[in-house]
């Protein structure tokens, strides 16, 4: 067995000299110290060897394994340096060449959509507000009619930083903060009309239409005499401005813990004029957002009297709107920093 070990080491040294790239290095590593290698088999069989030779063979086998690992690491470093030099040589720039025209940047496609939506609502009196992405459980859940251990929380897989702090799962956390601020004014003639946007986080598996991080817009209005009719008008106004067509909207009953009644908002398909296509899945309608009247329990939890105040709220995913407006099929395109993809939208940002 000692001869076999020495033969393994000699064979390794010969083959190591022939290694020219990292792929063949990986194969050599697997051959000599992988789980199915001859050396590993010998190490596993040492316990079956007679005691008088066990120590000698075990010591030699481990010494050879350490030597092989050290030489592999040294060879790997050499190969990496070699590949780096080749790469640097290929990317070498002749600084004496005449400079080409400068390329100017442009707005990110998501910022284009955000600014378009913001302009629509600031024109009709909404105020922009912003908040923190790390939020307390109180404002992210409890003040939005999602008490501790309530099953409705399962609708949003959440990243917890500790028992009290989370990465916000929606921009609706600003709804509870602004309602609480309105209640603190303690006057009946105050009203609220705000819009907020930003990153939110959920434990979704990333794929073509889902991401663990995405952007949303949230709107909230709250004053003495506001009704579902006002909500419907605002929704239709926004959709017609956003998609630049005289489209129709459809409201379907739904459920959200912080609104009652709640609706899903569909728009008539602006890609096929409601005739049926792959975008609208042959239905003629595209779902774009959720909305509703603020639940009276939410008003109470934030210190407002539901007999004096009513409110409306709705939210929309920025990436979803961008995907619909610009025919983008994969949400990951927004975050890969691919200049060739992003510069397509330069025209829209000018």
Curated annotation (Swiss-Prot):
Its cofactor is Mg(2+). Transmembrane segments: none annotated. One of its GO terms (biological process) is phenylalanyl-tRNA aminoacylation. It comes from the Bacteria. Disulfide bonds: none annotated. Keywords: Aminoacyl-tRNA synthetase, ATP-binding, Cytoplasm, Ligase, Magnesium, Metal-binding, Nucleotide-binding, Protein biosynthesis. SUPFAM superfamilies: Class II aaRS and biotin synthetases (SSF55681), tRNA-binding arm (SSF46589). Its EC number is 6.1.1.20. GO terms for cellular component: cytoplasm. It is an enzyme of class 6 (ligase). Its main location: cytoplasm. Binds 2 magnesium ions per tetramer. One of its GO terms (molecular function) is ATP binding. It is found in: Cytoplasm. PANTHER family: PHENYLALANINE--TRNA LIGASE, MITOCHONDRIAL, PHENYLALANYL-TRNA SYNTHETASE. NCBIfam families: pheS (TIGR00468). Belongs to the class-II aminoacyl-tRNA synthetase family. Phe-tRNA synthetase alpha subunit type 1 subfamily. This is Phenylalanine--tRNA ligase alpha subunit. The lineage of its organism: Bacteria, Bacillati, Mycoplasmatota, Mollicutes, Mycoplasmataceae.
């Amino acid at each position: 067995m000692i001869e076999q070990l020495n033969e393994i080491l000699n064979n390794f040294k010969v083959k190591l000299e022939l290694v020219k790239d990292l792929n063949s290095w990986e194969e050599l590593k697997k051959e000599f110290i992988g789980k199915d290698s001859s050396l590993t088999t010998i190490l596993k069989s040492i316990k079956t060897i007679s005691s008088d030779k066990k120590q000698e063979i075990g010591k030699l086998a481990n010494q050879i394994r350490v030597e092989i690992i050290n030489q592999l690491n040294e060879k790997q470093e050499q190969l990496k340096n070699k590949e780096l030099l080749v790469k640097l040589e290929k990317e070498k720039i002749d600084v004496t060449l005449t400079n080409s025209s400068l390329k100017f940047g442009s707005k990110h496609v998501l910022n284009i959509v955000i600014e378009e939506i913001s302009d629509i609502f600031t024109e009709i009196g909404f105020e922009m507000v912003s908040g923190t992405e790390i939020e307390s459980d109180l404002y992210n859940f409890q003040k939005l009619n999602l008490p501790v251990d309530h099953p409705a929380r399962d609708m949003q897989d959440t990243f917890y930083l500790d028992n009290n702090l989370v990465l916000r799962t929606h921009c609706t956390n600003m709804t509870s903060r602004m309602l609480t601020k309105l209640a603190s004014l303690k006057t009946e003639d105050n009203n609220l009309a705000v819009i907020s946007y930003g990153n939110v986080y959920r434990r979704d598996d990333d794929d073509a239409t889902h991401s663990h991080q995405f952007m949303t817009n949230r709107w909230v209005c709250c004053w003495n005499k506001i009704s579902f009719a006002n909500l419907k008008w605002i929704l239709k106004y926004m959709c017609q401005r956003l998609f630049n067509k005289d489209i129709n909207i459809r409201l379907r009953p739904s459920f959200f813990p912080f609104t009652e009644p709640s609706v899903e908002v569909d728009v008539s398909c602006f890609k096929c004029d409601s005739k049926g296509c792959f975008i609208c899945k042959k239905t003629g309608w595209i779902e774009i957002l959720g909305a509703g009247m603020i639940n009276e329990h939410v008003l109470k939890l934030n210190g407002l009297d539901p007999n004096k105040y009513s409110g409306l709220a709705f939210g929309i995913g920025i990436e979803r709107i961008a995907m619909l407006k610009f025919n983008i099929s994969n949400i990951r395109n927004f975050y890969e920093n691919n200049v060739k993809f992003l510069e397509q939208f330069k025209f829209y940002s000018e």
